[in-house]
Amino acid sequence: MPNIVLFSGSSHQDLSQKVAERLGLELGKVVTKKFSNQETSVEIGESVRGEDVYIIQSGCGEINDNLMELLIMINACKIASSSRVTAVIPCFPYARQDKKDKSRAPISAKLVANMLSVAGADHIITMDLHASQIQGFFDIPVDNLYAEPAVLQWIRENIPEWKNSSIVSPDAGGAKRVTSIADRLNVEFALIHKERKKANEVDRMVLVGDVKDRVAILVDDMADTCGTVCHAADKLLSAGATKVYAILTHGIFSGPAISRINNAAFEAVVVTNTIPQDEKMKQCSKIQVIDISMILAEAIRRTHNGESVSYLFSHVPL
């Protein structure tokens, strides 16, 4: 593809390499390092004048360092006269800080949006935003891609009894996502209502819907400490579910997450590779990964060629 340059930040080079291979491109030359005082240094190693630049950097690992690195890379390309800079952020950082949920709380997702725009980003490509309204925090175009087509494909290919299943949301916020998947599969859906007392602590859970003698498939946009999904799995089994799967777009798996999954009664915990999972998979045999590099690659190709991206909302590209 002419006039396109693809760069990778240091957060998820494996995913960037897969995207580059699917596009038939070499990753652009960039050197990122730290100065002795821990400031981030970025050197773009090739001309980007007049080029359509895409920078892949996920919000994971050392999130603040990686965000700063992304901002510097965007700015470096912008002031080097690139024609357009697109930030490809598979897992958007600070997405859970999207509203004032208590007095004096910051809306950090809006701050990140402002920072990306000020750095010089002309366009954002991301996946399964925690709240889709975050798109409205930007004054530049945002394409929020969905893992749903890849999730549907995985369910059909890997769960033999999927026709006798219930798609379950572990909280009220995910009801829309779950009903969409249930409708596409033509199966039942259920919802777990939770009453939260403190952040990252789950209290009482109430199941709305029927899972008796069915395979329960928990679906959510992210799993962090996994307290919610593991409690939900216990609730579903006690309500008569025959098996429980969890399918989550962003597998953050921080703190006690891995030990909780190992001790929970999941058949499998399935995540996408918006975040690197190799180390986590070594610690937990239940974790399986859906590759979404083809969705990102196709979104980049369509954006570069000025084609519609909405096809990807309902199809998995080959």
From Swiss-Prot:
Q: Where is this region: Binding of phosphoribosylpyrophosphate?
A: 212-227
Q: Example GO biological process term?
A: 5-phosphoribose 1-diphosphate biosynthetic process
Q: SUPFAM superfamilies attached here?
A: PRTase-like
Q: Which reaction does it catalyse?
A: D-ribose 5-phosphate + ATP = 5-phospho-alpha-D-ribose 1-diphosphate + AMP + H(+)
The activity regulation comment is: Activated by magnesium and inorganic phosphate. Competitively or non-competitively inhibited by ADP, 2,3-bisphosphoglyceride or GDP.
Q: Name the residues that bind ATP.
A: R96, Q97, D98, K99, K100, D101, H130
The residues that hold Mg(2+) are: D128, H130, D139, D143
Q: In which pathway does it act?
A: Metabolic intermediate biosynthesis; 5-phospho-alpha-D-ribose 1-diphosphate biosynthesis; 5-phospho-alpha-D-ribose 1-diphosphate from D-ribose 5-phosphate (route I): step 1/1
Query: For this protein, what is any one GO molecular function term?
Result: magnesium ion binding
Cofactor(s) needed, names only, are: Mg(2+)
Family membership noted in the UniProt record: Belongs to the ribose-phosphate pyrophosphokinase family.
| UniProt-listed HAMAP family | RibP_PPkinase_B
On assembly, the entry states:
Homodimer. The active form is probably a hexamer composed of 3 homodimers.
Q: Which NCBIfam families match?
A: PRK01259.1, ribP_PPkin
What is the annotated role of this protein in its UniProt record? Catalyzes the synthesis of phosphoribosylpyrophosphate (PRPP) that is essential for nucleotide synthesis.
According to UniProt, the name of this protein is Ribose-phosphate pyrophosphokinase 2
